[in-house]
């Protein structure tokens, strides 16, 4: 499980390398389930690699 989360975190990192994305767009780009996406985001957040930004009702994620 830990290895899969790390792999998914790498895929999220690659998707965010071109700039911040809204959560729904990120999920579509990396083709992960909601559970797997949030696990990968948690991994990257704990490592202080990403930031979250709320605009209106949408949440964006980007690389630090």
Annotate each PLM feature.
Residues 25-29:
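A short acidic, leucine-rich amphipathic alpha-helix
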Residues 2-9, 19-22, 54-64:
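Short, cationic-aromatic polyanion-contact patches
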Residues 15-16:
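Short helix-to-turn junction characteristic of helix-turn-helix DNA-binding domains
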Residues 2, 30-31:
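A generic secondary-structure micro-motif detector
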Residues 32-43:
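Short amphipathic alpha-helical interaction segments
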């Amino acid at each position: 499980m830990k290895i899969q989360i790390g792999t998914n975190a790498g895929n999220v990192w690659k998707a965010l390398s071109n700039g911040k994305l809204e959560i729904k767009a990120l999920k579509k780009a990396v083709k992960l389930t909601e559970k797997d996406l949030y696990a990968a985001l948690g991994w990257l957040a704990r490592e202080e690699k990403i930031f979250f930004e709320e605009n209106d009702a949408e949440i964006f994620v980007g690389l630090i």
